[in-house]
Design a protein with these regions (language model features):
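Extended, histidine- and acidic-residue-enriched regions that form the cofactor-binding/catalytic faces
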Residues: 1-111, 119-274
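Conserved SAM-binding loop
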Residues: 114
Length: 274
């Protein structure tokens, strides 16, 4: 049994004594970027921390999980034209997160979940998890709180599709996690231009499945997209509970995954000692 759930609280003797091959490491990755006029730039960090705080209390003592320090700054160049946004280049953050994965692998841990709270990090994580598989035959998982879903019928289909930034979902979560930072007097329905694009064009979309490179101002000049005025703390609390429970299910999946499923190809087999 591990003495803690947090990587940073372990001593080197704790790591030496632990069977790290049985541990699942979790790397929370976030962003510091503008979130419209009604929310702080730390939204993605606060949401990741809030979900994790909700989940940690539900992790059984005998579940070998270690949560690494939150990586607060990510790839946010799509928001760089708004004051307060901090961003790494895609090259810098890819290298940094890959090297964190290298360090995790060097402890003997070969299961790592990237727990993301910012859409702009997606291409980075896709590249990093593949690289860690190549380097370490590691189960490197690309996960996100958003991908774990929300309670049924809580948000409209339009909001789920287009309320992607500082809309109903994120504002509700912030009302649950950090209400002291939310300015509901400045919240509104920040209508995304993606809705008009979807109606006007046959295949072209702003994001997916066939999208283009966009800046936040392309969606809405105020830097938000979605109906923030409809947000409530009750919805945020329900989302937090849903996400925490789903995260535990994900941990169980990753713990149960047999690394023997990750097969070496013929060149790797040829390099292996006989």
């Amino acid at each position: 049994m591990l003495p803690t759930t947090f990587w940073a609280e372990m001593s080197w003797r704790d790591f030496a004594a632990a069977d790290m091959s049985k541990v699942v490491a979790v790397l929370p990755v976030a962003a510091i970027e503008q979130h419209g006029p009604h929310l702080p730039v730390g939204v993605d960090m606060f949401i990741n921390e809030g979900y994790l705080a909700r989940a940690v209390g539900r992790i059984p003592d005998d579940m070998p999980v270690l949560i690494l320090p939150v990586q607060a700054i990510g790839k946010s160049n799509e928001h760089a034209e708004y004051p307060g946004t901090l961003t790494f280049s895609i090259e810098t953050v890819t290298r940094a997160w890959t090297e964190i994965g290298d360090s995790v692998a060097h402890t003997g841990c070969r299961k790592l979940i990237f727990m993301n709270s910012h859409g702009g990090n997606v291409p980075v994580i896709d590249a990093v998890v593949r690289e860690l598989r190549v380097r370490h035959r590691m189960l490197a998982v690309h996960a996100a709180w958003q991908r774990l879903g929300y309670p049924a019928d809580m948000f409209s289909a339009v909001e789920r599709a287009h309320g992607i930034h500082a809309g109903d979902v994120e504002t509700s979560l912030m009302l649950a996690f950090r209400p002291d930072t939310v300015r509901m007097s400045e919240a509104q329905n920040f209508v995304s231009s993606a809705i008009a694009v979807e109606k006007e064009f046959r295949h072209l979309r702003v994001t997916q499945p066939i999208g283009f490179g966009w800046m936040s101002s392309d969606l809405n000049e105020l830097g938000a997209a979605g109906d923030a005025a409809n947000a409530t703390a009750d919805k945020g609390e329900a989302c937090a509970d849903h996400g925490a429970d789903a995260f535990l299910d994900l941990l169980r999946d990753v713990l149960a995954f047999d690394l023997a499923r990750l097969k070496p190809g013929p060149l790797a087999r040829a390099r292996s000692p006989k």
